Regions:
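N-terminally biased helix-coil "hinge/interface" segments that flank
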Residues: 1-188
Length: 188
């Protein structure tokens, strides 16, 4: 079935009927149910994820394009970079900046964020990834962007890099949060 949970429930119901009990009776007999699925990885591989936008610090819109700078064949210029997980057309620059010590360099421009939110509405995005520079040192700007998204785009899931993957290296946080956000509409 299209809903993967329904498939699991149907299989459990069938198993229960083979034992001449109902589903609640079967579930009561067990201590734990572990279910694994390839649903998320299949969606990524086939490109059937949600239409996702990326919000990042102004001046750094190409983080998913440039990655960490390496190429599989650094001297073969015929080998193209892979396409970014979120297209550049759905990447938005947020005027703000924290430094590596968590000190605010540029205040968060909330009016600009609200303007971006209006653009997100017009583009009918289904999920939003947020990865601001140095949010791992001070998450206040990223958290505030999350608050604004929740208020002005209710029902649209979003992921914040400082919560999902609070680690050094912007690309790793950006790619993790992009994947997480893109799967939320499918997995909930």
């Amino acid at each position: 079935p299209e809903d993967p949970v329904l498939g699991v429930l149907n299989a459990l119901t069938l198993a229960a009927s083979k034992r001449n009990i109902d589903l609640p009776g079967l579930m009561a007999k067990g201590d734990m149910l572990i279910h694994g699925t390839t649903y998320a990885i299949n969606a990524i591989i086939t490109g059937n994820t949600a239409k996702t936008a990326l919000l990042t610090t102004a001046g750094h819109p190409d983080i998913l394009v440039l990655r960490e700078g390496g190429r599989v064949e650094p001297f073969n210029f015929l080998v193209p970079y892979p396409k970014p997980y979120i297209p550049r057309a759905l990447t938005f620059e947020v005027p703000e900046r924290m430094d590596s010590h968590g000190q605010q360099v540029i205040p968060l421009d909330e009016e600009a964020v609200l303007s971006i939110i209006e653009k997100l509405k017009s583009k009918n995005v289904e999920a939003i990834a947020v990865c601001l520079l140095w949010s791992i040192a001070n998450s206040s700007h990223e958290d505030r962007v999350g608050d604004l998204l929740a208020k002005h785009l209710p029902g649209v899931p979003y992921s914040l890099s400082n919560i999902l993957n609070p680690a050094l290296r912007e690309y790793r946080r950006a790619s993790a949060v992009a994947i997480d956000a893109s799967l939320k509409p499918l997995m909930t």
